[in-house]
Amino acid sequence: PVAPGRRGPAVGYYRPRSHDVLDVADCLLQPETVTALRLAFLGWMEDFHVPPYEETSRSGLIRHLYVRTNRAGEALCCVVANGSSLPHTHELVRRLRQLSPALAGVVLNQNTRDTNVILGPDYHTLWGRDFLEETLCGMTFRLSVPSFFQINRAQTSLYAQALDFAGLTGTETVLDLYCGIGTISLALAQRPPRSSARDRPQAIEDARANA
């Protein structure tokens, strides 16, 4: 989240049980690429006086900075804005690319609703790709901004073991509810039972592309 701070925009995490944003310069749980992108983004906001979103008055522009990474070290950066455009877009992209050569794309998400839901319905690619690729179970998956993928990637190694425990014969129909980008459905398809997946439209779009 992004919010007004004591010394300028705060880009970080919510304090426990509050809507107060704690400015966090680094986090041991995230790749160094994310830290570099945050630094470049914050500098752009400060230098060009881009206002953070203030949820009480519903004023300001920048609501969130959303970054995805993959095992290859690439990053996809999404700026969630209370509007349909950003000022000084070319300078933002230049700074992000300069501090993170592994940047694959920059996406603008428009969220003008009075809500605590992070992402709005509309996306616009400012530069590069609007997706990353990740390899799992010998398959390559496409990850776009809104689609779910296991945050703890090490856990995905359990997929093959879970499939073995299931003892599928190939005659079953398997329902994959809240399927995300279809990792489990497509892993099951190698066995091969019939599988049917359900999720939000953006995730299903990625799942179909992955299939």
Residues of each region from the PLM?
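SAM-dependent transferase fold signal centered on methyltransferase-like domains
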Residues: P1-H124, L136, S157-A160, G167-T171
